[in-house]
């Protein structure tokens, strides 16, 4: 199993479809041998049941040829480890999965499939990758990169306001929520205040004891 990991919105899903899917098609793989499901889509909600997901894939894999199984947001499937272990026993299935949130941390999933899975780490854009799509000189590009980072979607926004709104949304509704869920934090307002304090002193040493007090 190939396990695609990385922070949210860094391009994990895009790596598999269209990039990897188009690579397979360009190299002669029959489209019927590519089984893809976006498990966070309402139209695929029934396949968040592990038994139904298993049955769906096996109904598609009708011969002994290799089938490429691409499962996006696998954490939506209850007890997804069990269905992935079942796929591992099928020699004609080449499985690729992505996942997000606290249920799918890299260390957890790699431990579960140690020796039976390969981790593919996806990162935000490097500066050179950012500059390959940035419309401007390197000095301005560096300032943009330092200020807004390398999440791929940032490169599609024109105004500073759009970029700031996008990043604030990711921080408040995605990243912080993952921390809250992972650590079972009940007072999320205190966490947000703590993050603001730490963010205001970037580049300075932070003393956990002082923060606690």
Language-model features: where?
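Conserved P-loop NTPase "ATPase switch" module shared by AAA+ and STAND
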Residues: 61-80
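Hydrophobic anchor at the beta1->P-loop junction of P-loop NTPases
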Residues: 4
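Short glycine-rich substrate-engagement loop in P-loop NTPases that contacts/grips substrate
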Residues: 35-66
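Interdomain hinge/linker elements that couple catalytic modules in large macromolecular machines
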Residues: 123, 128-213
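Conserved lysine of the Walker
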Residues: 12-13
């Amino acid at each position: 199993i190939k396990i695609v990991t990385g922070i949210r919105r860094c391009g994990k899903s895009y790596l598999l479809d269209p990039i990897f899917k188009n690579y397979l098609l360009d190299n002669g793989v029959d489209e019927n041998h590519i089984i893809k499901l976006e498990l966070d889509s309402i139209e695929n909600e029934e396949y968040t049941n592990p038994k139904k997901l298993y049955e769906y894939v096996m109904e598609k894999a009708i011969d002994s040829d290799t089938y490429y199984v691409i499962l996006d947001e696998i954490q939506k499937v209850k007890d997804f480890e069990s269905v992935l272990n079942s796929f591992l026993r099928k020699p004609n299935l080449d499985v690729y999965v992505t996942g997000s949130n606290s249920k799918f941390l890299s260390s957890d999933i790699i431990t579960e499939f140690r020796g039976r899975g390969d981790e593919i780490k996806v990162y935000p854009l490097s500066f050179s990758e950012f500059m390959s799509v940035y419309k401007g000189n390197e000095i301005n590009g560096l300032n943009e990169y330092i200020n807004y980072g390398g999440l791929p979607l940032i490169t599609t926004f024109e105004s500073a306001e759009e970029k700031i709104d996008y990043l604030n949304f990711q921080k408040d509704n995605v990243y912080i929520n993952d921390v809250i869920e992972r650590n079972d934090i009940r007072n999320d307002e205190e966490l947000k205040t703590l993050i603001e304090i730490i963010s205001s002193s970037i580049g300075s040493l932070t003393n956990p004891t002082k923060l606690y007090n």
